[in-house]
């Protein structure tokens, strides 16, 4: 994928994240866009009102089998562990056969931290940093809550 396409798709994911910003309880509003192996958008999602479902879940459910070999653009590191049971987003991405994840910024929350490492251990190519400045601004309040032990 080209850097230009990466920036455009991350911009789309960040726009999705802004839709529910402040409406997702203690969870951050995340945006996710899934491309198939040919580079076509096959799914997208934003964290649901109240914090569930996660953006990756919505996008992967929409993409279905078309996600195989594709790329996921996610505004915040996919969770490594699930607080409410079920599979974590990093596990769901792996099980869907995603080949590459482009993540704007890592997540310091204990349940998410390590999601990138889990994806890489599964053989998924992960790139971090496209859209980082915008994501850092979007998640500033969430990051402060995590560091203060309130999230």
Language model regions located:
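Short, basic/aromatic recognition patches
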Residues: 4-25
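Generic detector of well-ordered alpha-helical segments enriched in charged/polar residues
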Residues: 11, 136-143
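Generic structural signal for well-ordered alpha-helical scaffold segments
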Residues: 14, 18-21, 60-64, 143
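Acidic, glycine-enriched active-site microenvironments
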Residues: 29-30
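Zn2+-dependent cytidine deaminase-like catalytic core
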Residues: 34-136
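Phosphate/diphosphate-binding glycine-rich loops and adjacent basic-rich segments that engage nucleotide
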Residues: 141-151
């Amino acid at each position: 994928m080209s850097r230009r396409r990466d920036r455009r798709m991350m911009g789309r994911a960040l726009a999705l994240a802004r839709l529910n910003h402040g409406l997702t309880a203690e969870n951050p509003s995340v945006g996710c866009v899934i491309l198939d192996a040919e580079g076509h958008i096959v799914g997208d999602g934003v964290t649901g009102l109240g914090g569930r479902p996660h953006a990756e879940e919505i996008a992967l459910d929409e993409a279905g089998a078309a996600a195989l070999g594709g790329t996921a653009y996610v505004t915040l590191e996919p969770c490594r562990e699930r607080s409410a049971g079920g599979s974590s987003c990093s596990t769901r991405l792996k099980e869907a056969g995603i080949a590459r994840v482009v993540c704007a910024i890592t997540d310091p929350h204990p349940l998410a931290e390590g999601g990138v490492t889990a994806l890489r251990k599964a053989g998924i190519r992960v790139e971090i940093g496209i859209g980082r400045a915008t994501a850092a601004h979007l998640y500033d309040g969430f990051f402060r809550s995590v560091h203060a032990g309130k999230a």
